[in-house]
Amino acid sequence: MNKHTTLPNLMQKLVSDEEIQLIAEAVGYRDSSRTFTLRELIHFFLLAAMHQWKSFRHGADVGPLYGLPRFHYSTVSKKAKEVPYDIMKRLLALIISKCNRQTRRSLRFPKPLRVVDSTTVTVGKNRLPWAPYHGERAGVKLHVAYSPEFSLPADVVETTGLRHDGPVGEQLTNAQQVLVEDRAYFKIERLDRFVEQHQLFVIRMKDNIELHQKKSLNRLSSTSSSVQTDFTCQLGTKQCRSTKRHRVVIFRDANGRDIRVVTNLFHASAETIADMYQQRWAVEVFFRWVKQYLNVPTLFGTTENAVYNQLFAAFIAYVLLRWLYDQTKKQTNVSLSFISFVRRFFSGQLPLDWKSGMAAALFEYAQIYGRRMYNFG
C-alpha cells in the first residue's frame, strides 16, 4: 500500500503534533509512553475504521503493514483505556472547524439547518456493564447535530443507550441556525421557550397533539405541491396548552404519509418548511454510512474511554474523507460518487484525474493555511 494514501497521513497534514499536545494538556493528560504514543493511538483507530479491523489483536497483527509500529495488542488496549476520550472528542471538533471552512453547499434556506438526531450502538450486556440497554444488550448513544450544508456533523454528545433524546437535545441548540428535529424532541413547553429565545425550529409533532383555534394562512395553491394545509394554532389540551400560537404545516411525503411539523418560521413558504424537515434524511444517511463503512458496530474495548475513543475516531475518519472528496471534486470534471471515491481511495485505485485533483486541492489548502501537503495521493 502507498503510505501516502492513508487517513493518518491526511490527518497528520491537517493537525500538528503541537495542536494534539495542546488538547491533551487541556484535559490534563500527559503522554509518557515511548512505545505507543497518543498520535499512534489516533492513527490506529483511524486505520481500524478505514479497514474495518475486528479487534485490538487484529490491529496489532496487521498494523505494521499500514505504517504503525510493532506492538502487542495489550499495549493498544491499555492505551485506549488510559487516554481520556475527551481528547478524541476535542480533536473531532478541531478537524470539523478546519474542514468546514471551505466546504459548503447552498440549500437556498433562510438560515443554515441544524439537524439533530441520535444513533445507538449495542453489544452484549456483559461487554459494557456500565451502559445497560434493553434485555440482554448494552449500548451507547451518540447524539449528533448535523449540518446538511457541509455534509458534516457539527456537534456530538455521548451518552449511554437508555438516555432519552429530548433532554440531550437541549445541549445541541444553536440560535444562529434552524433546528430540525423528529418527534422525540417535541415538547410544547420547549416550543414556547424557543420562540422567546429566538431559536428557529422545524420539529415534527406527535400524532396525538390537539390543535386549538386553527387559523389558515394565505398561500398560493399548487397541484404539484406536497403541502396539504398551512395554519397557525395553539398546541395541546386545556390542561397543557402552548402560550404561543405556532405555525403548523402538514405535507405528504414520498410514501404518501401525512407529516405534521410545527415551526416559528413565518417568512418562508410552506413548501420551504416541508423541504427543511425532509433534510432530516441527511443525518440518517450519515448514521447508516458510518455504521456500514467505518466499523462503528464493532467495539474493541469495554471501558468508556476505549469505546468513545473508537467512536469519535470513526467520526473523524468520516469528516476527513468527506472533506477530501468535496475538495477534490471541485478540481475535476470526472463524476464520482462519495462511496465510489471512498472505495477507490481505500484500495488505491482512484482515477488519474481524481489523483491530480486531490493533489491540487491539498496544495491549495497548504497555500491558504500554511501547512505542507506534499506527497499525498
Swiss-Prot record:
Q: Any signal peptide, and if so, which residues?
A: none
Keywords from the named record? DNA recombination, DNA-binding, Transposable element, Transposition
Q: Could you tell me which cysteines form disulfide bridges?
A: none
Has UniProt tagged this entry with the keyword Nucleus? no
Which domain of life does the UniProt lineage start with? Bacteria
TM segment ranges: none
Any one Gene Ontology molecular-function term assigned to this protein's record: DNA binding
Q: Which GO terms describe its biological process?
A: DNA transposition
- Which family does the similarity line name? Belongs to the transposase 11 family.
Which PANTHER family did the record assign?
Answer: TRANSPOSASE INSL FOR INSERTION SEQUENCE ELEMENT IS186A-RELATED
Its name, as the record gives it, is Probable transposase for insertion sequence element IS5377
Q: Which organism is it from?
A: Geobacillus stearothermophilus (Bacillus stearothermophilus)
